[in-house]
């Protein structure tokens, strides 16, 4: 939700993720493909003529944004390369030319693409989906093909993400929420359970098929440049023209919007994410080269900090770690130590309520936290501490600290228990 002020500086100006609805462009192709699959109108291995990336719909010309040089290919491949021509032709031929535009609109509504998410934050607009053949909605012969590629519809980033999250969640659509529980002094005082919007937005077969399509986009399509060797993600790139209008024989474009919506890990999704960049200023404006790198950075950082996403290096029974690999005689702030050990799921027993503690390994595969005495007006024992904790304690006592080495404190020049009177203490780290 970073915006740019007139002076060129960036600021949290407006909650665009919730409050700004735009024509999404190619990320909406997922909905078009899922509608076709749900109505059993296409097979992913069917052939489709992409006409080299240029086609005519009545008096309007449609061009594929990213050149691909393909003519006849599979429906699957047309989606991977994000062919406007391919997806638009499929929807036009199966719904438009057969007079079944109402069936396509019904499917979009089945996917809840015409409804708010209901998030408890003010300012969410209702997504815009035209009513079939409505003069009031300016329905025309090009409406269906244009809707299929993300035009003549509007949706917010959060609403689009809710749809993609449902696909990642095997069809179950959940209401977005920001708060899971409220705690006071470490105790939960109120919980907010997850709320299901719809148990299944499409059949299992259709969901399985579009999940494969989204994985294909990353493996072989418009997102392959940024696929990861450490984990697999799935998603769809999007590039949309903004404020466009026809002036005679040419089209005037007022700007672009780049986006990427996806989830990871692809085989067992835990996180979904959408990145939307309105009017990028880098000189490029394609979703695959502007928004996708941002998604990848977010996914990389999330993956690196979630230990549950890493595979165990050893599938054999755990070796006894006590006195070998578990920390022993390490000293630190008790609450910090407890937080780290809990996060790493290392069993421990706390035997002190004091501020500072020392870790001791037991004979079994566990730890115990014991009291580390910090007498007032006397030099404490900081051996085993990290430098940050040692400096905090010693400098607050009025001592001057000299440091040699890196790591944890191995030796200190002044004996613990010595009365403090502004001396200089030297710490040897290792």
Which functions belong to the PLM regions below?
Residues 265-269, 273, 277-313:
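C-terminal, active-site-flanking charged/polar segments
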Residues 1-26, 31-277:
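Beta-lactam-recognizing serine transpeptidase/beta-lactamase-like catalytic domain environment
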Residues 55, 268, 280-282, 408, ...:
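Generic "edge-of-domain/loop-turn" microfeature
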Residues 169, 280, 414-415:
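Short beta-turn/strand-loop junction motif enriched in small, turn-promoting residues
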Residues 32, 103-104, 294, 298, ...:
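Generic structural signal for hydrophobic residues
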Residues 159, 291-294, 386:
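Helical mechanochemical/support elements of P-loop NTPase systems and associated helical scaffolds
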Residues 130, 275, 297-430:
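Ligand-recognition elements built from short beta-strands and adjacent flexible loops
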């Amino acid at each position: 939700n970073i915006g740019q002020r007139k002076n060129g500086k960036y600021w949290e100006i407006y909650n665009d993720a919730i409050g700004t609805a735009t024509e999404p462009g190619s990320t909406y192709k997922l909905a078009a493909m899922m509608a076709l699959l749900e109505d059993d109108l296409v097979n992913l291995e069917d052939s489709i003529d992409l006409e080299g990336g240029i086609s005519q719909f009545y008096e309007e010309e449609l061009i594929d944004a990213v050149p691909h040089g393909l003519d006849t290919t599979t429906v699957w491949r047309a989606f991977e390369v994000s062919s406007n021509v391919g997806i638009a032709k499929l929807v036009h031929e199966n719904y438009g030319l057969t007079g079944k535009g109402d069936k396509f609109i019904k499917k979009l509504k089945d996917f809840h693409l015409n409804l708010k998410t209901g998030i408890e934050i003010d300012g969410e607009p209702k997504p815009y989906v035209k009513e079939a053949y409505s003069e009031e909605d300016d329905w025309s012969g090009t409406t269906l093909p244009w809707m299929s590629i993300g035009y003549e519809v509007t949706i917010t980033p959060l609403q689009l993400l809710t749809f993609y999250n449902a696909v990642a969640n095997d069809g179950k659509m959940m209401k977005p929420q920001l708060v899971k529980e409220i705690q006071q002094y470490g105790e939960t005082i109120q919980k907010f359970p997850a709320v299901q919007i719809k148990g299944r937005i499409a059949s299992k077969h259709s969901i399985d098929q579009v999940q494969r399509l989204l994985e294909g986009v990353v493996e072989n399509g418009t997102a392959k440049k940024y696929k990861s060797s450490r984990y697999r993600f799935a998603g769809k790139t999007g590039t949309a023209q903004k404020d466009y209008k026809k002036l005679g024989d040419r089209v005037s474009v007022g700007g672009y919007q780049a986006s990427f919506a996806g989830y990871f890990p692809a085989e067992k999704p835990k996180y979904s994410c959408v990145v939307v960049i309105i009017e990028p200023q880098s000189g490029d404006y394609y979703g695959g080269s502007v928004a996708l790198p941002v998604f990848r950075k977010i996914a990389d950082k999330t993956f690196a900090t979630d230990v549950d996403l890493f595979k165990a290096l050893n599938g054999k029974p755990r070796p006894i770690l006590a006195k070998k690999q578990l920390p022993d005689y390490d000293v630190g702030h008790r609450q910090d130590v407890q937080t780290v050990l809990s996060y790493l799921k290392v069993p421990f027993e706390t035997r002190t309520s004091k501020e500072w503690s020392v870790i001791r390994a037991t004979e079994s595969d566990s730890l115990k936290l014991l009291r580390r005495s910090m007498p007032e007006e006397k030099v404490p024992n900081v051996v085993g501490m990290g430098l940050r904790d040692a400096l905090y304690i010693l400098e607050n006592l009025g001592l001057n600290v000299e440091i040699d080495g890196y790591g944890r404190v191995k030796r200190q020049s002044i004996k613990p228990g010595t009365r403090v009177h502004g001396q200089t203490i030297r710490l040897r780290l290792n």
